[in-house]
Amino acid sequence: MWLKRLHQRFDVWFTDHFLSPQFESLGSDHFVMKPWNLRVYGRKISAGKNLHVIADSSRKVSLSTWAYDDKQGQIEIGDNVLICPGTRIDSASKVLIKNNCMLAAGTYLTDADWHDIYDRTKPIGTTKPITLEENVWIGDSSIVCKGVTIGKNS
């Protein structure tokens, strides 16, 4: 029992010292299980209160934003959000996840094509924002592509 509490304290310490500085803002009462398996890349990534992330060495979690031309990707995560192992969120435009959402294992959210369909050397391609309204649950291994809005309580 004491060993489990010690491990949880270490997870909190690791998150506060190594992951928090990578977020533009990170709300209170967050918890990341195995935080060394969460990859935060890019600017303009923020999360609200009570974010819970479950990461694993075999199913890492990735939050990535990309800049191109004069644009910057953005990920905004609301309060009370659960992100499960293997989730990837990539943004070249904007991904908005509102309060009380759950992302099951292996989900992928992307707001860009990541290349043009005619000229594959053209970076990023077409982008359109993604919005998950409040109380949305994205099921196991789901893919949410550019321009999608999922309504409240879905």
Question: Where are the predicted features?
Answer:
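Conserved binding-pocket/active-site segment within a compact domain
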Residues: 110-113, 117, 126, 138
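Conserved catalytic-core motifs of eukaryotic protein kinase domains, centered on the activation segment
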Residues: 113, 120-122, 148
